[in-house]
């Protein structure tokens, strides 16, 4: 009997753990969390999750609220002006996303980090490969032309003259603060290229559902019987 009782206790614990939901949040869960915080405020997140009737961890509730559901979280595409600020501050501070987010009201550090990695950084890497290949081909052509010219006209260049015809291969993304330039990539060129719409349904990195606020508030009225 004692042995069976011990097994029952373990099974209960496993059952409780299995009830914790993982994966993307549903709109129903979002509405429950928004409604609860609107009426009771936030607080100890583990207690809040249980009190609200959500089968989520306190950490999951906290991150969902802070990164997606807070009323002051700014929605919609990152603007060209915001892109310039992100590039300027990243050139100064690197991957200090929380510090950068303080200069972009309504944007979260997670959103800025995802935008940087999936938009700006991706563009810089792709451009670097293209530019390096193009410049390398151009230099090879110059060298061949110079060799042919020297052979035909019996012209001998001094070492100093040869150095003057050589320009080093550009490097991408150097931490400079000159007119927002990243090595050979101006902010204007990058922002013009990476002005893609930010998904309003699924987050690129986390896979979380991302609702429009109009959808959420219209559903809130239905939930509250208004």
Swiss-Prot record:
Entry-linked PROSITE patterns: HTH_MYB
Compositionally biased tracts (Gly residues) = 1-13
**Any idea where the HTH myb-type domain is?**
17-69, 70-124
Please indicate which superkingdom the organism of origin belongs to: Eukaryota
The keyword Ubl conjugation belongs to this UniProt entry's keyword annotation: yes
Pfam families reported for this sequence: Myb_DNA-binding
Which UniProt key words apply to this protein?
Answer: Activator, DNA-binding, Nucleus, Phytochrome signaling pathway, Repeat, Transcription, Transcription regulation, Ubl conjugation
Q: What does this protein do?
A: Transcription factor involved in photomorphogenesis in the light. May act downstream of the light receptor network and directly affects transcription of light-induced genes. In darkness, its probable degradation prevent the activation of light-induced genes. Required to activate expression of PAL. Acts redundantly with MYB24 and MYB57 to control stamen filament elongation in the late developed flowers. Contributes with MYB24 to induction of MYB108 by jasmonate. Repressed at the transcript levels by DELLA proteins.
Name this protein carries in UniProt: Transcription factor MYB21
Look up and give the organism this protein is from: Arabidopsis thaliana (Mouse-ear cress)
């Amino acid at each position: 009997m004692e042995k069976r009782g011990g097994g029952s206790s373990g099974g209960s614990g496993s059952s409780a753990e299995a009830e914790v939901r993982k994966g993307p949040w549903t709109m129903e869960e979002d509405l429950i969390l928004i409604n609860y915080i609107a009426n009771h405020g936030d607080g100890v997140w583990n207690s809040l999750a249980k009190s609200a009737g959500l089968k989520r961890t306190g950490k999951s509730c906290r991150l969902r609220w802070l990164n997606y559901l807070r009323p002051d979280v700014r929605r919609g595409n990152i603007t060209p002006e915001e892109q310039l600020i992100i590039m300027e501050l990243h050139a100064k501070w690197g991957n200090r996303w929380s510090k950068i987010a303080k200069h972009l009201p309504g944007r979260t550090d997670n959103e800025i980090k995802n935008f940087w990695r999936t938009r700006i950084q991706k563009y810089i890497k792709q451009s670097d490969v293209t530019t390096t290949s193009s410049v390398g081909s151009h230099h090879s052509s110059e060298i061949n032309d110079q060799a042919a010219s020297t052979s035909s006209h019996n012209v001998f260049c001094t070492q100093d003259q040869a150095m003057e015809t050589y320009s080093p291969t550009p490097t991408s993304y150097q931490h400079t603060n000159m007119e927002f330039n990243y090595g050979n990539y101006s902010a204007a060129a990058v922002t013009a290229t990476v002005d893609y719409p930010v998904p309003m349904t699924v987050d690129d990195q986390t896979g979380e559902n991302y609702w429009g606020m109009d959808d959420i508030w219209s559903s809130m009225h239905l939930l509250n019987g208004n």
